């Protein structure tokens, strides 16, 4: 009975204190960072408020008591618990403080671990006509374990629970919950319950450890830089005063060495007849270029300072970069000319160009047109080089009479004709010669192959003669045949011997047939020594009277005929006519 009475006394004390105490305004604080409340887009609403029962004080809360949206319904019957969003870096300490205007006399802290909660925000949630701020979690946010008790807060006169919770606030008699060296496993919902229900809800998100601070990186080392800021046009009337000194902005960078500087003002007349007056910036940095010394329209353009008049100068011999922008007035300098023109006349109207040098190099420049209303022209700043005047040679200096080098007039080198293909070098000559030789070899080889192929084709092609049918046929090979030596009149090689050859009479009478010529060669002798008689051609049938010679049909073999060996060898070695 004693434990039961003790528990009953605890519950009665909690209920009495809760009814007599107003709901406090809750806050959350983290160490080292403050509480962050971030609005979120629409997401699924989970109100994780629960009602604490008798069994909740004995140990872990039942996870089934968490009902989505049920806490909002309870919020319409009583004051909703404040909701807080706390972001903590990994490894940091944080403290959840539930104190407000009214102290919480007794309560218990619970923890619900969740994962995947990327979109979390504190948003106004309305149920019917009642609205209250509540935590809004994304759909990907899911609990990993049931909600469990992690600490309690009771007055000193109330006996404590026998079981020590896993995490106990060091301030046992105040509604604080402190977590040391937070890890990602500490991400979740922390709720403070009292006898009437949830009193405060905290969502703690433990993120990655912030990167260690890096050593500050200074600007890259650079040389001094200057920039002139002035008016590009000034209108005046005769008798007025105008100042040519612009504002010079200086950035000395990391330089610690003294430097020299000059400020030069150049004057050029700007005729009113020029609709546009051009100032070419490349010529400020390269005043000796041929294009700058001999521009196309020198009267309406400012190109090289060598073509203008130097009207004023400031020369600084040694100046410290530690002075910053004050070096123009703090450093000693030598000057001549007038920077401020008082009681100006109309003759002083024109273009004034300021060129500033730093250690002998052009650092910045600026221009201003000082003119009356009648002589005002439009000035245009060009970023390209001007066009070269016709007849200007392409050699150094750009002039055919004299050039300027560091203020000294020297004769110009002789002009050379312009070669659009560049200067001829031995390498180019070698390439041209090699190309010509290769082309000659290719053409000669092609011609030789054509001649060779044509000769081979002519040698292998048989000779054909046309016929009356319009076709072509192989031409017969005619040669003399051996006959009786009585018909021999001379050598075959003698052209006149052909006329003396005898022809046998036609067996057909006047049929027009003319037999073949008989051979009169001495070599055509009868091969047989037994028969010394004359060879008589056998009678043949009459033939046509055409003048075209046809190849005779094969003769029957004659036993004692002439020797055709010489004739056969001649036919085999004969070439087509």
Swiss-Prot record:
It is found in: Virion membrane; Host cell membrane; Host cell junction; Host Golgi apparatus membrane. The keyword Manganese does not apply. Residues 117-141 are annotated as: Interaction with gI. InterPro entries: Herpes_glycopE_Fc, Ig-like_dom_sf, Ig-like_fold. Residues 450-577 are intravirion. Keywords: Disulfide bond, Glycoprotein, Host cell junction, Host cell membrane, Host endosome, Host Golgi apparatus, Host membrane, Membrane, Signal, Transmembrane, Transmembrane helix, Viral envelope protein, Virion. It is a single-pass type I membrane protein; Single-pass membrane protein. Glycans are attached at residues 87, 93, 185, 258, 343. Residues 488-497, 521-533 have a biased composition (Acidic residues). GO terms for cellular component: host cell endosome membrane; host cell Golgi membrane; host cell junction; membrane; viral envelope; virion membrane. A motif (Internalization motif) lies at residues 478-481. Its main location: virion. Residues 21-428 are virion surface. Interacts with gI. Belongs to the alphaherpesvirinae glycoprotein E family. This is Envelope glycoprotein E. The gene is gE.
């Amino acid at each position: 009975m004693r434990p039961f009475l003790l528990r009953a006394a605890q519950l009665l004390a909690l209920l009495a204190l809760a009814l007599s105490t107003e709901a406090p305004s809750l806050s959350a604080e983290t160490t080292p960072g403050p509480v962050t409340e971030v609005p979120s887009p629409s997401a699924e609403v989970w109100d994780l408020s629960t009602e604490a029962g008798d069994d909740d004080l004995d140990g872990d809360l039942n996870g089934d008591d968490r009902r989505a949206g049920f806490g909002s319904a309870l919020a319409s019957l009583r004051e909703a618990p404040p909701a807080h969003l706390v972001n903590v870096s990994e490894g940091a300490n944080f403290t959840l403080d539930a104190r407000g205007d009214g102290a919480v006399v007794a309560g218990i802290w619970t923890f619900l671990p969740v994962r995947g909660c990327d979109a979390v925000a504190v948003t106004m949630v309305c149920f019917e006509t009642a609205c209250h701020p509540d935590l809004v979690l994304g759909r990907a946010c899911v609990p990993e374990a049931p909600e469990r008790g992690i600490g309690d807060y009771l007055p000193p006169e109330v006996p404590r629970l026998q079981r020590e919770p896993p995490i106990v606030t060091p301030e046992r008699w105040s509604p604080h919950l402190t977590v040391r060296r937070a890890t990602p496993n500490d991400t979740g919902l922390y709720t403070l319950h009292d006898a009437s229900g949830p009193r405060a809800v905290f969502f703690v998100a433990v993120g990655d450890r912030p990167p260690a601070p890096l050593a500050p990186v200074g600007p890259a080392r650079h040389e001094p830089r200057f920039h002139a800021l002035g008016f590009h046009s000034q209108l005046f009337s005769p008798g007025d005063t105008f100042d040519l000194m612009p504002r010079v902005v200086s950035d000395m960078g990391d330089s610690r060495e003294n430097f020299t500087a000059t400020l030069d003002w150049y004057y050029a007349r700007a005729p009113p007849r020029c609709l546009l007056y051009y100032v070419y910036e490349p010529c400020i940095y390269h005043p000796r270029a041929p294009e700058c010394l001999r521009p196309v329209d020198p009267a309406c353009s400012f190109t090289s300072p060598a073509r203008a008049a130097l009207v004023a100068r400031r020369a600084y011999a040694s100046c410290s970069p530690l002075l910053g922008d004050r070096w123009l007035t703090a450093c000693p300098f030598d000057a001549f000319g007038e920077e401020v023109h008082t009681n100006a006349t109309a003759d002083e109207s024109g273009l004034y160009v300021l060129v500033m040098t730093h250690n002998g190099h052009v650092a910045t420049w600026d221009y201003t047109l000082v003119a009356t209303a009648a002589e005002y022209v439009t000035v245009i700043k060009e970023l390209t080089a001007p066009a070269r005047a016709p007849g200007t040679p392409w050699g150094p200096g750009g002039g055919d009479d004299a050039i300027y080098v560091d203020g000294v007039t020297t004769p110009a080198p002789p002009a050379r004709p312009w070669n659009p293909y560049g200067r001829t070098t031995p390498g180019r000559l070698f390439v041209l010669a090699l190309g010509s030789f290769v082309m000659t070899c290719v053409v000669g080889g092609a011609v030789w192959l054509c001649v060779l192929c044509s000769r081979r084709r002519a040698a292998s092609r048989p000779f054909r003669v046309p016929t009356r049918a319009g076709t072509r046929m192989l031409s017969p090979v005619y040669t003399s045949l051996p006959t009786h030596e009585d018909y021999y009149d001379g050598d075959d090689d003698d052209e006149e011997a052909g006329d003396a050859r005898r022809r046998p009479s036609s067996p057909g009478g006047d049929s027009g047939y003319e037999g073949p010529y008989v051979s009169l060669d001495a070599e055509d002798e009868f091969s047989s020594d037994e028969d010394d008689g004359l060879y008589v051609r056998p009678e043949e049938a009459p033939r046509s009277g055409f003048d075209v010679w046809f190849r005779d049909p094969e003769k029957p073999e004659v036993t004692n005929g002439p020797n055709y060996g010489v004739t056969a060898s001649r036919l085999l070695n004969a070439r087509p006519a």
